[in-house]
Amino acid sequence: MNMSAWALPEYIEDILPAEALKIEMMRRRVLDWLFVNGYELVGPPLLEYVESLLTGSGGQMNLRVLKVVDQLSGRMMGLRADMTPQVARIDAHLLNRKGITRLCYAGSVLHARPSGLTRTREPLQIGAELYGHQGLESDLEIQRLMLQSLAIAGVGNIHLDLGHVAVFRGLIRSTGISPDLEMELSGALQGKDKAALKELCAGLKKQVDASVREALQLLPELYGDENVLTLARSALPSYPGIMKALDELEMVASELSPLVDTLAFDLADLRGYHYHSGMVFAAYTDNCPNAIAVGGRYDEVGKAFGRARPATGFSMDLRELSGLMSSDSHPRGILAPFIKEDKALEKKIEQLRNEGQIVIVALPGHENDAGSFNCDKKLVSENGVWSIADALI
């Protein structure tokens, strides 16, 4: 057999029955929870024109999108790498509501390259977005919802990191440096690359005040418990935007601390800096080097679709979460015989299935295959009455 007939691309995998069931049950539980919290389900397309996929998401998204040529129009299309911009487009352009809108989603996304050595290129993204409210109340609602969703998915020992892009932005906006240099600085901070940060700041001596350069180089050190905020207030310039951001972090932390095992502040966390506009957050758990859920405020993304709206949201990868869960045994079923025109048997099978039980009808020649069907029970007839009995596996 030709190996290429069954080989898959790197970092692309099939999902086999046991994991597929685990993922699907997790997806249902999380979506049900989002639904009772007032979040409406939307389903953006897997494929869009590249211009739409990249609108408002910054240049970094361009490297993550797999592109194909539309054979109908000749235009370049892309497979979505993140559903967040798509949902923002739906809110801004299609729903066009005046008040608050709560939306949720679940679906596969595709990355041109894996985001980490242990990550798939085809995550199953699930998340929620809240549009139309700019206060801390919506930030808290979304972050609380994220933590509750992780708990519902079965994740324990949650560590929450909180950051705020307004701290870095407040320092930079006072300098007048170019957007390209701003992105270089944000990249060095996000990567905690102190050497690169020092070199960049050294090149700013003539145009940036020494206190700001020192503050920029201090940001990677501002990671840890509530003492980080105390140090930041004393060491960073007391610009109103920075002080407001620190106050917001403190208030949110006081509300969320009871919901997590540990909580830390990271003032150099600039994940998604090209579109985030306020608080950012990431959840971690034991035995996983990657963030298991991420989110933040992104008030300007809708503007690219013709309607700027305050927005905050979170997303997580169900496939990654599934890998953290212990493998539950596959639910057992009930084996039923194949008997033509037995109305009592048909009625019993229908009743059991309506109750949520798995009933597998053994096709002719396979009556003794209870074990291969994962059945530990069987239907037996006594005096014309069908009932459940133990099956020998």
Curated annotation (Swiss-Prot):
Pathway(s): Amino-acid biosynthesis; L-histidine biosynthesis; L-histidine from 5-phospho-alpha-D-ribose 1-diphosphate: step 1/9
Biological process per Gene Ontology, one example term: L-histidine biosynthetic process
Entry coiled-coil feature ranges: none
Location relative to the cell: Cytoplasm
Domain of life: Bacteria
Classification via Pfam families: tRNA-synt_His
Function, as annotated: Required for the first step of histidine biosynthesis. May allow the feedback regulation of ATP phosphoribosyltransferase activity by histidine.
Subunit record text: Heteromultimer composed of HisG and HisZ subunits.
Name of the protein this chain belongs to: ATP phosphoribosyltransferase regulatory subunit
Gene label: hisZ
